[in-house]
């Protein structure tokens, strides 16, 4: 989009602040992996792997740095992520042998909006060492992943809840929706 998108404002707040607000009630600590944007109160950590190895490497860094057994992973450009959804996914993570709880909407999983057990760290490291870069690919080969779909509607319009701002068109839509 031509500049650091996490600092772009939607509804009067930078994108990253929307995500921070959604996480702040359910998460003991906010970790910001990579990126050049600053977020007051967050602990900033770098990817542990050289080069740009994608979101799975960011998840690895976050899991490694986390001080608690359950971690919520969220992309920094989700202006409509809700506190209720974050809390719900983390709560579902505590059920039995579940190691990750991921939204699935319209046939597509959203692994950059999910709850992960810190115990997944060895599996993530191994997958990265073996050349896996895609989070979805990693999750497909992992036992104990739970996908949630219809229940997303309890927290709002799933299309908005899971929206990322990846283009000028997405930004225009987000600003329009935020103004409603």
Regions found by a protein language model. Give the residues of each.
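Long hydrophobic alpha-helical segments typical of transmembrane helices together
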Residues: 167, 179-180
């Amino acid at each position: 989009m031509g500049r650091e998108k996490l600092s772009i404002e939607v509804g009067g707040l930078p994108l990253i602040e929307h995500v921070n607000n959604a996480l702040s009630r359910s998460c003991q600590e906010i970790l910001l992996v990579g990126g050049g944007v600053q977020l007051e109160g967050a602990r900033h950590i770098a990817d542990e792997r050289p080069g740009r190895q994608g979101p799975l490497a960011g998840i690895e860094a976050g899991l490694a740095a986390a001080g608690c057994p359950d971690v919520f992973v969220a992309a920094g450009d989700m202006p409509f992520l809700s506190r209720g959804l974050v809390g719900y996914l983390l709560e579902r993570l505590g059920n039995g042998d579940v190691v990750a709880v991921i939204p699935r909407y319209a046939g597509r999983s959203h692994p950059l909006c999910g709850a992960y057990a810190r115990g997944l760290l060895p599996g993530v490291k191994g997958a990265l060492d073996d050349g896996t870069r895609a989070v979805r690919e990693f999750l497909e080969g992992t036992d104990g992943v739970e996908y949630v779909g219809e229940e997303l509607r309890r927290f709002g319009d799933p299309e908005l809840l899971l929206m990322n701002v990846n283009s000028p068109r997405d930004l225009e839509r987000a600003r329009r929706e935020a103004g409603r």
